Amino acid sequence: MALKILSVDDEADLEILLTQYFRRKIKKGEYEFSFAHNGVEALKMLLEHPDFDIILSDINMPEMDGLTLLSRINELRNPALKCIMVSAYGDMDNIRSAMNKGAFDFTTKPIDLGDLERTIEKAAEQIAFVKKAQDEHSQLASIQNELHVAQEIQETILPKELPCFDESVRGHFDLKACMKAAKYVGGDFYDFFRIDSTRLGFIIADVSGKGVPAAIFMAISRTILRTIALSCPSCADCLRQTNGMLSQDSVEDMFVTVFYGILDLGTGHLKYSNAGHNPPVLIRHDGRTSLLEPTGDIALGAVPDIPYCEKETVLVPGDRLLLYTDGVTEAMNTSGELFGVRRLTDICASSSGSPQDLINAVTSSLSDFTGTTPQSDDITLLALSYR
């Protein structure tokens, strides 16, 4: 693409001089010259054709001088537009003033065309650099916009409302969850859904990695898990089938840890399977805390055709569960110390409120602990109370 140069000078001979000297570059399409005879005419041309690259302007002109034109050009706020000022030899005051106003360079009359050519080439290098930076900034802005859209889409995937149950069992539980991605989008997710008239299914999961790849794998995993879970009565069999599907077309180093529980709201009977996930905290009605016993299984998508185990426990009214991802326990403070499971269980033991109160207590303590340390992993919590 031709370098577009606007020459602004009230001397008519300069137009002939420039077109003659640069005729080869003009013929090759490297340079494209336009001419104005004063600042007013030049400014009008700039406003009508804002794609000029270089302004070659005399300082002393009628109607609008070069310094005034330079000030008006600065108002256009185009960092890719470079101004080369032309002044009489020895007119250092005007040259200094032009440079202070942001001129790229200057040359003196009589014009040394060889020197002017080198100055134009230097300006062209700067223009190419600025335009490349502008393009990269535009691409970054586009990517950020797409990530914002992806974030909104991911947020719509996560459930917002509790599943509907008859009044006879609806009052037996409360549940709250939250997810805070380390980047625009994350690989953690949670889910909860009605299986039948008395059973509630709930899931927390953590995909390996972060960012867009993890978010895509998260959406796939969540869809497969939920689809199978709604028609499969067994936690273990649900994870086995999901693992089989994820392993068929697995991407290298992509897997997902999952805790899946099914709670009978009428009896408090809890069945669960754990595919390599952090064991949830069980908070008994009297404040005692313990970690649910792991089932010893590995993450989904890592190894095909393996069985998964299922364990059971019973909740009584007043008992609560806190499910979490390792972004909680592995969060670090400014000294490099991990938040850890012990701090988490201590918070659970001291918080006696609703699931939302429990989540608030954990996130508040986490924020106080990490301080100014940037979040390095997705943080997800799901709290459930049985009443």
Locate each region found by the language model.
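… and, occasionally, acidic/histidine-rich disordered N-termini of signaling adaptors
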Residues: 135-320, 371-387
